[in-house]
Amino acid sequence: FDAQGRYIEFAKNTFPKGMTLDGLKVVVDCGHGAAYRVATTVLRELGATVFATGVNPDGTNINLDCGSTVPEHMCKIVCEARADVGIALDGDADRVIIADEQGKLLDGDQLMALIAEQMHNRGQLKGGGLVATHMSNLGLEQHLDSLGLHLSRTRIGDRYVMEYMRKHGYNLGGEQSGHIIMADHTTTGDGLVAALKILSLLAESEKPASEVCRVFTPLPQVLRNVAYTRGDLLEQAEIRECIVAAQRQLGKRGRLLVRRSGTEEKIRIMAEGENESLIRDVVENVAGAIEQQAG
């Protein structure tokens, strides 16, 4: 049973028939993880000139200073090799982050926007938009709205994105962190398949990645974590009133998300909007109220 060989053929079959990556210089960082053989093989068989890194797993070095969680390593190689594009996968290869030819990063929001627009133009996008989480940038939502598409949001986690997609008939979804779910091909995030979609658009356009892949300007986003050790602070009246006041202050100019971490004893506060000074004030006010009650 040749699992690697079958996956290589599956991945290549998601790439447009008759198209190649001839002449494209691609850096791929496999994070010393699951895709360390298959990603480089697929890219080379499609014709790309491949500069590979993160392809020497030893059982302990997965994601160590490499891959999509530390994409700066990949960006550096893109610039040194004068590559056309860089791809960083995480250890289990379900996430992808892209770098343009200047070594500048493109997160999952940018990739989803690009894929959605292309699928929409070709009549392939189902559900009238895409599914993402509450962490996706408001700029993505505004960009989709300008195309007559909508963004449906779920709680954080690619499993919740997929559940919503199945329930409501979408075929594209994902997370800002680089999980991209293309339900016509897979039922979970597949970093290589998503990367191949982006590479096909690059090959088709014959333009630099910086022009093709940066489709909207993200709005400023401010994140703050507040540690706590007791009780459900977000249910306290003083904090709820502060959050409501902050949301009223932002109005339609921004968005505020306050939630408990699912993995740590922390409350995460995120605000975004066109006025960075305003959103910083909002985050500091909410964080201050939480810290006062937590103290």
What positions do the PLM features span?
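Short hydrophobic/aromatic-enriched beta-strand-loop microsegments
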Residues: 47-54, 105-110, 148-156
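Short, glycine/acidic-enriched loop or turn micro-motifs at the edges of active sites
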Residues: 32, 91-95, 103, 178, ...
